[in-house]
Structures are given as structure tokens and as C-alpha cells.
Amino acid sequence: MIDTLERLRTDVDLWVASASEDGHAYLVPLSYHWDGAALLVATPRASRTARNLIRTGWARVALGPTRDVVIVEGPVDAIPIGADPELEDAHALAAGFDPRTLSEEYVYLRIRPHEIQAWREANELEGRSVMRGGAWLE
């Protein structure tokens, strides 16, 4: 669990998986901010990622390399630009860019972990669940 929290705190980018209504998979890298309780990403409001995640209200994301991966799954809330300046400032600092300065309309997507799995090698597969039902496991 400590390694997982460290990765959430220190990584900058993650992969976001989503699917269209007709089942076409879509995968995109996004920068994020971890506030200790949720992941915050920003993407163009008209993007497939935003449309898919807002429609389903659920996300599955991956952080880290394949041999030290963290998989996070949970509900998504859309936050319009300007709704929470403090959170938006934190995202800009962590992500290295500020979507509020861009001409294209962006939306923030808050992903609240419901389940987290983490593992490095096959010997860690059995104990890979570190969060279930929104509660950290020992």
C-alpha cells in the first residue's frame, strides 16, 4: 500500500481507458493530480475520453510501467473549469499545464478510487488488491 500511495503522489501521467456506446475501446495518456482521495485529470470537453467517462460515470486508469503497475477503478465526476480554483491550481502545478489558459473548452474529471490493484511480478498477483469498496486493505 505504501508503494501505491507513493506512486499516486509522485507520478505525473496515467492511462485512461474508456469505451464508446457501441463498445469501441479508447485509451489515452493524461496528466493528473492526486489530492490524497481522488485523481483529477483534464481533457477537452468534446474529446472521446470526456464523453465516454461522463456518459458511464466510471473510469479505469493505469499508472506506472507494466512491471510496477497500479490500476485504479472508480466513479467519475465532471467538474467545469472555474468551479474549484484551488483544485484547478493544484492540478496545474502537478500536471505542468493549465487548461484554463487554453482556447479549447476543457473539463476536469475527478476519479474517486473504488478499487486499486498493484503488482510488480507474478509473485504479487495474489495480494494485488490494496483497496476494495473505497477502503484501503492492510
Language-model segments: what does each one mean?
Residues 3-4, 49, 87:
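Hydrophobic alpha-helical segments typical of transmembrane helices
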